[in-house]
UniProtKB/Swiss-Prot annotation:
Belongs to the class-V pyridoxal-phosphate-dependent aminotransferase family. PhnW subfamily. This is 2-aminoethylphosphonate--pyruvate transaminase. Its cofactor is pyridoxal 5'-phosphate. Its EC number is 2.6.1.37. It is an enzyme of class 2 (transferase). Keywords: Aminotransferase, Pyridoxal phosphate, Pyruvate, Transferase. It comes from the Bacteria. PANTHER family: 2-AMINOETHYLPHOSPHONATE--PYRUVATE TRANSAMINASE. Homodimer. The gene is phnW.
Length: 368
């Protein structure tokens, strides 16, 4: 494993030896010890948002998108209407989920380098009283842009609407306090800023909203109301849980708390991001976003304009030097992305910058 490349991606990402070792134990899915492990994970997750008094944590097998679909399908009534705020690929995915689920929805899309504003949301809600819910990506992973969650949340509350937050790439690293930011649901997953492995999503659902959601869901497996009710009654998952993923997340959360919790995790990622931005700028590579809206999670860079630059060749050469990057996901310009999260520090980020510089020299890329 010592020769494995460092994953500079938004997840899955590089995990610690301790986290990987936690998966070497097999668990019985109905066993009391595993039930206690699940309960401990949910309790620790709720503590990160100070949400124990207001929200339930409902874990769900699968990727983060499974949990997003479950949240929309469970909490948005079939006669509800969702306003989907879009400035990237994952906002577009929210809209596609609403379409597939048969939920009425409207969209508001800004450019990929433009955050949605509270004023936008205020105007849109005033224009359409049929809207019941607003769905927002906190950190849009396709670029790394940070949308102004606190301001938008207050506007939504003032209009008497309900907020669903996709916090997949921000939860655990960027502060979100359930006592200060009103939301009906917040969705995240095991394999992002918590530095677990992928395979489990979770939804923080407002207690009263979840209680009222019986019968809304389009799916048996993705019914969060039923999932929570069964867990509350038995302590068990309804269907086979990802036991090793839960065990890894439990260990990752222990390390998260040892590191100093959210403030420390945020600071390390912020240091990683600064090292990356400064180093790439010295090479001549330009970041796609201005600093004031750049989250310290993943950074999008403009690709070199030199004809000798080809991403696949660039990717393989950087990988051979020990780092896995991420392709761009923008529609208008060619880019690539570098993650700042996972078990990596500023020294590792500087080594990645050095690898990129070496590869560009090897490829004789001059026009950057």
């Amino acid at each position: 494993m010592s020769n494995a490349p460092i994953l500079l991606t938004p997840g899955p990402l590089t995990t610690s030896i301790r986290t990987r070792q936690a998966m070497l134990v097999d668990w019985g899915s109905w066993d009391r010890d595993f039930n206690q492990l699940t309960a401990s994970v949910c309790e620790q997750l709720l503590a990160i948002i100070d949400g124990a008094s207001s929200h339930h944590c409902v874990p769900l097998q699968g990727s983060g998108t499974f949990a997003v679909e479950a949240a929309i399908g469970t909490l948005v009534p079939r006669d509800g209407k969702v306003l989907v705020l879009i400035n990237g690929a994952y906002g577009q995915r929210l809209a596609k989920i609403c379409k597939v689920l048969g939920r009425t929805y409207s969209t508001f899309e800004t450019a990929e380098d433009q955050p949605t504003t509270a004023a936008d949301v205020d105007r849109l809600l005033a224009e359409d009283p049929a809207i019941t819910h607003v769905a927002l990506i906190h950190c849009e992973t396709s670029t790394g842009i940070l949308n102004p969650l606190p301001e938008i949340a207050q506007v939504i509350k003032r209009h008497g609407k309900r907020l669903i937050i996709d916090a997949m790439s921000s939860f655990g690293a960027l502060p979100i306090d359930a006592r200060e930011i009103p939301f009906e649901a917040l969705i995240a997953a095991s394999g992002k800023c918590l530095e677990g492995v992928p395979g489990m999503g979770f939804v923080f659902a407002e207690k009263s909203a979840l209680a009222a959601a019986e019968g809304n869901a389009h799916s048996l497996a993705m019914d969060l109301h039923d999932q929570h009710a069964y867990m509350a009654k038995t302590g068990q998952w309804r269907f086979t849980p990802p036991t090793h993923v839960v065990a890894a997340l439990h260990e990752a959360l222990q390390q998260y708390n040892e590191e100093g919790g959210l403030p420390a995790r945020h600071q390390r990622y912020a240091d990683n991001c600064k090292t990356l931005l400064d180093g790439m700028a010295a090479i001549g590579l330009r970041s796609f976003l201005p600093a004031e809206i750049q989250a310290p999670i993943i950074v999008t860079f403009h690709a070199p304009t030199d004809a000798r630059y080809q991403f696949k060749d660039f990717y393989e050469r950087v990988k051979a030097k020990g780092f896995i990057l991420y392709p761009g996901k923008l529609t208008q310009v060619e880019t690539f992305r570098v993650g700042c999260i996972g078990v990596v520090g500023a020294d590792g980020m500087q080594a990645a910058v050095n690898a990129v510089a070496e590869v560009l020299r090897e490829m004789e890329v001059l026009d950057i």
